[in-house]
Amino acid sequence: MGLEVTGIDHLYVSVSDLSRSIAFYDPVMRLLGFRKGTDPIAGEPHVHYYNRETQFSLRPSKRPGAHDPYSAGLHHLCFRVGSATDVDTAARELRALGVDAVEPRLYPEYAPDYYATFFSDPDGLRLELVALRRMRTLVREHWGELTEFENPVRKAGLV
């Protein structure tokens, strides 16, 4: 079957307090280049943030409870940006907004060029910004040559 997923169309996050989450996400998503919409769905308020490729939406949770990244479900959400400089700039601007973003750095335990910052939303959902990694570029450029995905770039002799 020749079907290929070309991206993630949308991601919905249930939040415990929609107003509090809007106060957090409005400036964060604006900083990341997203635009806001507020179309309700089935009579319930929803907030949608769009960029060229993806929709990120907030909806009120139906049951109380704190986010637990180690229970079944979403562990964290990572947004990719163009460069380490972009990560540095975004982390600095997030901190200026009052967001507790960790100092960006390399995380070689993930990949040799994994440069990121981390922060959390009001419900404890861990968010991340990572610089475009060489492996992602190589996978995209050499997709047709790659057949194994345990260290695909190394196995194909591209690094």
Predicted segments — roles?
Residues M1-I22, L77, R133-V159:
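N-terminal beta-strand motif that seeds the catalytic metal site of vicinal oxygen chelate
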Residues G2, N51-G82, D88-T89:
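Long, continuous compositionally biased terminal/linker segments
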Residues G7, P45, R52-T54, G73-H75, ...:
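Residues that flank catalytic or metal-binding motifs in active/ligand-binding sites
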Residues Y12-S57:
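Core segments of cupin and vicinal oxygen chelate
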Residues V15-R20, C78-D123:
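Vicinal oxygen chelate
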Residues P112, F118, L129-R136:
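Short beta->alpha transition motifs characteristic of CBS
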Residues R126:
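Glycine-rich acetyl-CoA-binding "A-motif" of GNAT/NAT acetyltransferases
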